């Protein structure tokens, strides 16, 4: 994986086996998301006491925060099988019927990227979630008939990074909804300490803090950085991941103290040094860094916005005083005023000049 890919929250295919070995097995092992864990614990304990499947669960939030792990934990806590699929994999209603009719009583069905499920399949899911029934249509035209099929009671766990794309009827059928937030540095240090123990890595408190501070609030990124830092410690140090070793390793991989990578810094550098802090249109900024506009908007900007280094206004992108400081520069005298300009409606710019 490239240096820039190190701080991407998206899961790479080759990471599946690695992540599986680090996943928590129960709610007690799951670090962070305290309120979500407490709410889930109460719901699951109540369901076990009644001897019935719990309500359907919708987990939303950015990638890499543990939605898949929680789905696995729900099944484990209930002592039932888990079946996993994703919205893009269900292209036709028939695909969903095949999955639903194969479920055993009490089974947990995990549907990742549920916002991307095909509309015909989504509409079929309504009755399945509410009444544990699907209507299979036989034939076409006026002679078509609907045959109801009863399903075994099950619990659907849906996960989405784009909860705003869910339709109202689908959202309303979830009895339990939870939004997962980014982790703070202390929580990420706990995640790293646990992962280091499972991987047999000697990680000092300072080393954990250093990696946590560069992990963008995301456990997946923290664990990925830990692997690279471990390699450096074994090859160029004494095998112990200390604060100094972590800094040296991540310097090689172009991940700075805030978790910015090469592209992030290139965007900030162009915005500050070439355009005086902005405002500048997205297309112009993308040309300046030699990337597609979509790449800048989808890959770099989300974290720069969250880190308070950049804002989007009706006139274009503007660097904040913190961006100047991060690059070792003094903010311009009028930069505070420019960075407090009204944000663009829906995050859009006027056409770049």
Curated annotation (Swiss-Prot):
Coiled coil: none
Compartment(s) where it occurs, according to its Swiss-Prot or TrEMBL record: Cytoplasm
Catalytic activity annotation: ATP + H2O = ADP + phosphate + H(+)
Region (Large ATPase domain (RuvB-L)), start-end ranges: 1-183
CDD domains assigned: AAA
EC nos: 3.6.4.-
GO-annotated cellular components: cytoplasm; Holliday junction resolvase complex
Superkingdom, natural source: Bacteria
Alphabetical list of Pfam families matching this protein: AAA_lid_4, RuvB_C, RuvB_N
Binding locations of Mg(2+): 68
Residues the record lists as binding ATP: 22-23, 64, 67-69, 130-132, 173, 183, 220
GO BP annotation list: DNA recombination; DNA repair
SMART domains: AAA (SM00382)
PANTHER family named among the record's database cross-references: HOLLIDAY JUNCTION BRANCH MIGRATION COMPLEX SUBUNIT RUVB, PTHR42848
Function: The RuvA-RuvB-RuvC complex processes Holliday junction (HJ) DNA during genetic recombination and DNA repair, while the RuvA-RuvB complex plays an important role in the rescue of blocked DNA replication forks via replication fork reversal (RFR). RuvA specifically binds to HJ cruciform DNA, conferring on it an open structure. The RuvB hexamer acts as an ATP-dependent pump, pulling dsDNA into and through the RuvAB complex. RuvB forms 2 homohexamers on either side of HJ DNA bound by 1 or 2 RuvA tetramers; 4 subunits per hexamer contact DNA at a time.
Known partners and oligomeric status: Homohexamer. Forms an RuvA(8)-RuvB(12)-Holliday junction (HJ) complex. HJ DNA is sandwiched between 2 RuvA tetramers; dsDNA enters through RuvA and exits via RuvB. An RuvB hexamer assembles on each DNA strand where it exits the tetramer. Each RuvB hexamer is contacted by two RuvA subunits (via domain III) on 2 adjacent RuvB subunits; this complex drives branch migration. In the full resolvosome a probable DNA-RuvA(4)-RuvB(12)-RuvC(2) complex forms which resolves the HJ.
Family assignment from sequence similarity: Belongs to the RuvB family.
Domain notes per entry: Has 3 domains, the large (RuvB-L) and small ATPase (RuvB-S) domains and the C-terminal head (RuvB-H) domain. The head domain binds DNA, while the ATPase domains jointly bind ATP, ADP or are empty depending on the state of the subunit in the translocation cycle. During a single DNA translocation step the structure of each domain remains the same, but their relative positions change.
Name recorded for this polypeptide: Holliday junction branch migration complex subunit RuvB
Protein's gene: ruvB
